[in-house]
Amino acid sequence: MIAAVIPIFVISLSNISHIILAIFFFPSIVEFLDDLYWGFTYRSWSPIARQLELGPNIYIHHSKVSILMDKADLYEKNQSRKDILNYYREEDKDFEQYLNFRENRKMLQQAFESGTLIRKQNYRARIHERMVEQPVTEKKELLRSR
């Protein structure tokens, strides 16, 4: 009989200890869950490019971005072909927003690449300025000024 009671006693003690630990670490658990919740919802939503500047902000989850980009790519590819029926526009009411979103992403990527290129060019120009020797006359003027 004692052998049957001991496992129940151990299980109940372990459950109580887990509850006590959870109560003791409650603020950190709440912060962790809060970070987890906002990490998967608010921070992972990105705005769609709007047609009108005064229009409402519309957000889209990052996991759908690739699907929408593929849809927009397929639409543009199929638009040139006459034998394929373009059903996307009638089926999807927000398809124009998807296309705008993709264009916005392309523009952001181009801006990032051109910004990186400009930074590289500026860096190379600064290195070139440091490496190029000064003319002899400037060196003499510097020595005279000292």
UniProtKB/Swiss-Prot annotation:
Q: Taking the first listed entry, what is the main subcellular location of this protein, grouped into a coarse class?
A: membrane
Q: What keyword terms does UniProt attach to this protein?
A: Membrane, Transmembrane, Transmembrane helix
Report membrane topology: Single-pass membrane protein
List where the protein spans the membrane.
Answer: 6-26
Could you name the Gene Ontology cellular component terms for this entry? membrane
Question: Where, subcellularly, is it found?
Answer: Membrane
Q: What is this protein called?
A: Uncharacterized protein T05G5.4
The organism encoding this protein is: Caenorhabditis elegans
